[in-house]
Amino acid sequence: MSFRGAGLRARNVSAAVLIVFLVISTAALPGCLRRGSEGKDQVVDKFESEPTISLYINETGEKRQIKMEEYIAGVVAAEMLPDWPRNAYAAQAILARTFTLAKMSEGGMRNEYGTDMSTSKDETQAYDPDSITDVIREAVTATRGMILAHAGRYVKGWFHASSGGETTLARDGLAYEGAEPAYTKRAAVPAELRHIPDDELYWSASYSLAEVRSLISAQGFSLGAVNRVSIIQKDPTGRATKVRIEHAGGHTDISGAAFRSALGADRVRSALITGLNSTSAGIEMTGRGFGHGVGMSQWGAYGMAQEGSSPEEIVTYFFRDVDVQKLWD
């Protein structure tokens, strides 16, 4: 399973790390994307005009037609904090638009609701039209029709709240099971560290051993009474990629991403665990960052925008060999 990553605002609503992909209407559109059946990266085609998408309102059961750019504004408002610089919002808009268009061939929520997407953050993408500001509208307008592509195909526009200073690859941050995408990379993010508040950057969490057993067992792992927890493998950025749980029945090794998800992604904010003390009483952890660490760091985008980077410079910084393309005027 591949995850997008809880945004700065959306993460406060859901503790889960979500897979976040959207689709636009399957009605025939001039210049629409080629539609496949396997959900793989799609070839980029231009549109003659801005698409309209269908949206299922989970709260009311209503189905609504909405222009793409209006929808993107609601997504950006839901995924980022208020009062941020315009170019940070604009970078987020490019990724949100890329996600939406990349899923045109995958059916969206048509099997469930007969629509392209829903307002459920667990099913698609965070959406909050009531929080759209003038600055967000300006950012969406400034990037109208823009998406991020690699070799003529849409990228998986992963993002996360904070990288802790360096982003990582999908196989490490997400335990991504497919081939590593050619456009992911590890990138130092000094602009993030220059601007992020300490309470956003650093975190700590503690659990009793009984809690560890209960939470990890709930994910389908068979554990005896837990005796010790340790990190046995890290990636080059320092993120835990394999965690060992020693218990009465032996030991169980799980990925760092699975460990974080099991214990709660709102408490274990990232796999960039800088300290883990395991005793008979429980475990205490410290770490940096928030989210899986793959793709664009939102606090990195904030810092880069504050220091004068354009939206295009921001999004291309976090991915390898990509370019921004404009698909409609």
Stretches with model-predicted labels:
Residues 1-329:
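Conserved, single-site charged/polar hotspot
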